Every structure is written in C-alpha cells, then in structure tokens.
Design a protein with these regions (language model features):
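Conserved beta-strand elements flanking the ATP-binding pocket of the protein kinase catalytic core
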Residues: 161
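Short secondary-structure junctions
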Residues: 154-156
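Glycine-rich phosphate-binding loop of ATP-grasp-fold ATP-dependent ligases
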Residues: 19, 174-188
Length: 188
C-alpha cells in the first residue's frame, strides 16, 4: 500500500482553474507511480461520507476536474455566507483529510495558496506539505519584497520597478513584462 497523498486544489484566487488542472495532472502522475492520491477543493471541501474512502483512487479524475471547474465560487458572496455561519476559508472536512494524509501536495495557485496563509495553518496543525514554509511563501509572493530580500544578497534578478497606486510613471522601457506585485505566476 502506497503513501496517502491529498492534493489540494481550487481555492478562491483568480488562478482557481489552472490550480484544478495542475492538481489533476499531479494526481494522475502520483497514481501511476503507486501512490494513493486524490484531489480535494480546499474551499468547497468534501462530504463527510466520502472522507473514509478518500484515498481509494477509484474516482475519475477528468470528471472530477470538470466538476470542480464548474464550481467556481462567487468568492465575496460565499465568504460572507460562511462568516454568517461562523465558518472560515477551509471547506468541509479539508483539514481532517489533510491530517489523515501522509503528506499534502500543494496544488494551489495565487492568493490563499502560494502566499503562506495555508502553509502557516498546516504548520500550526502539524500537517506535512510540499513546497516552501509559510514565511518563504509569504515573502516570495510579493515580487517587490522578494527583490528587496534577494538583491542585497547578490542574487541576480531582472531589472524592474514597482508601481504603486497614484505613482506617476516617468518611463518604462519596452519590451517589458507587467505583473501584479502579489498575484500568482499565471497572472500578468
């Protein structure tokens, strides 16, 4: 019997769909290599009756991928509804599944996935996960902060400027790449 791996996907960022696609491919590869792996949407979670059989590898991942993509939340509306019920970010049974897993594969992209928030929660709960720790994730999510940390250490970085709201742009040479400071890698 192989390791039990929970692949967390989805979430609430603008990169939700790419997260689901990435996680589907990762899960397929893990299964081909003998691991008991399955996908859970970190925001929507899973029904209680499916928790015990989560690592059985018997679901159709392509069908699950399509289903999850169709569950795209109206984030603000959903978060307000959860607040009214006294619930937080994590979907039903997500944390319980992650605690049962031998390790959690972080298939999330963007905010609430790559920015250290989930990593911090997992560290507090003793949940093992892939990727960088919460502080490294938080620093690297901000392109401006990353540059401020790495350049003084002599690590080469491409030239760039950070523009803030109300900032008057004097000159930006072309060609250039425009990215949101704290957006995920697939935005911009």
């Amino acid at each position: 019997m192989g390791m039990n791996i929970a692949v967390i996907a989805g979430g609430t960022s603008t990169e939700r769909d790419i997260s689901i696609l990435t996680s589907t491919k990762v899960c397929e590869s893990l299964r081909r290599n003998g691991y008991n792996a399955n996908i859970v949407d970190v925001f929507f979670g899973i029904d209680s009756e499916n928790v015990d059989n989560f690592f059985n590898n018997d679901n159709d991942l392509e069908k699950l991928c399509k289903y999850l993509k169709n569950q795209t939340p109206d984030v603000e509306k959903e978060l307000e509804a959860r607040k009214a019920l006294g619930k937080g970010f994590f979907g039903d049974n997500v944390l319980e599944l992650c605690q049962k897993a031998d390790i959690v594969f972080m298939g999330l992209h963007g905010s609430n996935g790559e920015d250290g928030k989930i990593q911090a929660a997992f560290e507090l709960m003793g949940i093992k996960y892939t990727g960088t720790d919460y502080i490294s994730s938080a620093i690297s999510m901000s392109k401006e902060l990353t540059k401020k940390v790495l350049v003084p250490e002599g690590i080469p970085m491409p030239k760039g400027i950070a523009l803030h709201k109300g900032h008057k742009v004097e000159y930006v040479p072309f060609p250039c790449v425009v990215k949101p400071c704290c957006g995920g890698s697939s935005v911009g």
